[in-house]
Amino acid sequence: GANSVLWLGLSDDMADLKSENKVLRESTRVQGIVSVNGAHSFNSQNWKKMINMSDKIFDFMIKRFLKYPGMDVDKWLVNYKLKKYQEAIDYFDFMDSSDPPMLVANYGDMVPKSLSSFNHHPIHAKYLKQRADSLSIENYVFAPELGIESKDINGILDFILKQLSE
């Protein structure tokens, strides 16, 4: 959920104004983004940089994380690493100064207790904040484990009400 919200909110408008389908002509732009415990990126290279991880360890981690019946993880990894695919999914690299305000809250543990904990690590919030600040995107970030707590807004509800009133 949180990653999908970031992908949609940070993507360029996908409206197809020439479509005969009324739904496809609608804008996909949002007024604000709320992401709770999401990752900073879908790009494997960005993840490896964040946690200083080798390809071998990253592949091992993904293989353990994606262990589902019928899932061909090796095939998934090959497709996932394709540059064209990475460019299409990585909302971190989509970010630009035209993006809507965002609230990012990450309350994960500093020491991951499981493989899925990496997806919810507070450092993701730090990376999103740094990127948003560098692009002058209005942002409110809460990652208490890292000492990051926006003082300009009193949480998710205040953020949502602020975005809807503007």
Question: PLM features: residue spans?
Answer:
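Mobile cap/lid helix-loop segments that gate and shape the active-site cleft of serine hydrolases
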Residues: 10-14, 44-94, 100
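Structured segments of extracytoplasmic/periplasmic soluble domains
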Residues: 7-11, 36, 94, 131-135, ...
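C-terminal catalytic histidine-bearing segment of alpha/beta-hydrolase fold enzymes
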Residues: 102-117, 122-166
